[in-house]
Amino acid sequence: MAHIALVAILALLTICIAIRAQDTVNATTLTGKYMCGYQGWFECPGDGSGGGWFHWFNSQNPVHSSLNVDLFPDFAEYAANELFATNMHYSDGSVVKVNSSYPLTTEMRHFKWMKDYNIDGVWVQRFGPKHVGWNDFTNKVLLNCKTAAETYGRVFVVMYDVSGANNSTLFNDMTSDWMYLVDTFKVTSSPRYLKHKGKPLVSVWGFGFPDRSITTDVAQQIINWFKTGAPAKYQATIMGGVNDDWRTIGPPWDSVCRSVDIISPWFVGRFGDIAGADSWKTNNLIPDVAECKSLGKEYLPVIWPGFS
């Protein structure tokens, strides 16, 4: 069935390589997991969030010329009250409706699909503020994922994306947010929050990218805090989402990228055909794995469902 592939579009999933899931996923290790990135950033007027259109369209006019996704999902399995009308129409004249990430029913449906089709869990992504009300929205999505993971025996992990972040406040913003999630939302107390190497797992995505504002000193400060600098209940095993040239980037990013516990290079869009994939395997994947082995680091490759 195509719908799990379509979850990739509903949440812009990037699927991390691993193996078959079980009815209740082992939440003590990342090893052997088939995990997806869950961005949860689709908003619709009337979804309960109090916001307008976000990410489905690049304006508040929900027409095809403003559509902001590459592939359009099949919503056949959604209930009528989960969908929100646009100003677009299908060829038969019926109104095109889309889903929001805000209602709990959305995450419950996605996590049920993940259980049905043997996906172990998700990286629930957290971005800096996108608009007024964004923090409340993204908190609701995270709590929805927590509830859905607990219901369907999946796992979830917080993934911070530094895209667009303010470098001067990023360390305080991220560490304060993590402490809030641990203390107020009790995310790491959930039996479905994924642990690895005896600690909760956290990912920070965006190290070593030339178009991200984060500097090496702030990146290293964040890594050190999660690994050993924070009070014990906030410490975590940290996975770094790094640029594809992490191994050859040179100083000062080379030492930063090598200081995380798990290295996960960004593959998305790096090749577009079989020949390109073969070249990537030879020139990146194999030497990346060898480098990680020599460093005593773990390695998590990424695949994606296919879009421009």
Q: What is each PLM-predicted segment?
A:
Residues 21-308:
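Glycan-processing catalytic domains of CAZymes
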Residues 3-19:
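Cleavable N-terminal signal peptides of Sec/SRP-targeted secreted and luminal proteins
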